[in-house]
Amino acid sequence: GKYEPKPSVQTIANAMDVGDPSNFARVLDLYGHSHAAITAEIEGCSYVDEEISDWVKKCFSSNGYLLDPHGACGFGALKDLLKENEIGIFLETAHPAKFKDTIDRILDADIEIPEKLQAFMKGEKLSIPLSAEFSDFKQFLMSI
């Protein structure tokens, strides 16, 4: 196989829309630039908005678990690829309330934002510019 970056395709799972992911170099390095090694352990799935929405609805209606759009892609891939008698897990990195407008529209509901998340969302973003040099990063960490 040959890695060929593609233009991003916008979906409601916006972090999954990257056509040329910056972290792909890490995957290549981890697997020694071997396509065979990568495909022996990694499979991929892609979903359009309607499918992502369906996974959110199915999961919520079947067990009351509310997925965010990215988790819905992981859940869908697990359901699509899991073989009979296999057990699998999927992980989510965000609370569905981070995508409240999207989830509300999918479920035709008004989901609640947990108090702790509400407080966090009211906080001020703090960023400190650093160079790409490890020594500068280390110096900053040692200073705090």
Show where each model-derived region lies.
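PLP-dependent amino-acid enzyme catalytic core
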Residues: 1-144
